[in-house]
Amino acid sequence: MTIFAVVILSPDSVLIRLVEDASPDVDSWTVLFWRGALYAVGVSTLVFLKYRSKTISEFKNIGKGGLLIGFFSGISTGTFVFAIVYTSIANALVIISTGPIMIAIVAWVLLREKSSLVTWIAMVIVFIGIYIVMSGSVGGKSLVGDFFALITAVMMGFTFTLTRKYKDINMVPVNAIGGLIAAVIAVFMANTIAIPKEVVTYIIAMGVILSISFSLITIAPRYMPAAEVGMIMPLETVLGSLIAWYIIKEEPTMNALIGGSIVIVTLFLHSWYSTNQAHKLEKI
């Protein structure tokens, strides 16, 4: 399920770049509006197909906790778009892939949840990798995009930590709220919400991709341990960067390759270790 979701999500970054580059009148806010709006509509449609007459109740039941999670989700949706626009796709995806580490940090701050020594070591190594990636952007606008990517990872940390706190909430409708929040903010900031007809297909594809992939990612931890989900998620960084290289000829910098390798390998090994520890505890 998670692998399928990640594979579907992989072209997302390239679609953002293709839409944003289509016309000088289309700015990042325009892209964000359509991304958020179609995400909200797509997820709401999935909720309706499952719950039918209970759809409105499902949205009402998310409560204040769901709205708070939706807020952080909406902010991360926005910062992700700006990250992709202002820095290389490889840089953005590598930095955003540190989400699991950000979750551990936010959980420590908000929930006073203690992390193991292995996790703290992983954090240090990951931040070294991020430093290497971002050091290659110093002096250019790419550094702005790198910071947006870092904010996205932090917002993801808040989103998933609060998801664990409010674990009884149905998170699929919350995804729709996040998209709606992003769209509402963007509509007031965009120069125009009109888009060239040649990118309509890209926009629709973006909405479908987000709706399906994030809905699957949201429910995946119900069927497999979170650590195992974490082992799969870095796959998006690799696939997304390769797709960008192939379609828009954007080659990763040496800093991105070195720093990205450090980050991805560390995240994979940490998730692998966590999975093994969880399996050992189950056998006791």
Language-model features: locations:
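C-terminal transmembrane-helix exit sites in multi-pass transporters
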Residues: 80-82, 99-121, 133, 238-258
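Transmembrane alpha-helices of multi-pass small-molecule transport proteins
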Residues: 23-75, 102, 155-159, 175-191, ...
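C-terminal-most transmembrane helix of multi-pass membrane proteins
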Residues: 36, 135, 234, 238-284
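Loop-to-transmembrane-helix transition segments
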Residues: 1-5, 54-79, 144-152, 187, ...
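Glycine-/small-residue-enriched transmembrane alpha-helix faces in small-molecule transporters
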Residues: 1-32, 71, 79, 138-165, ...
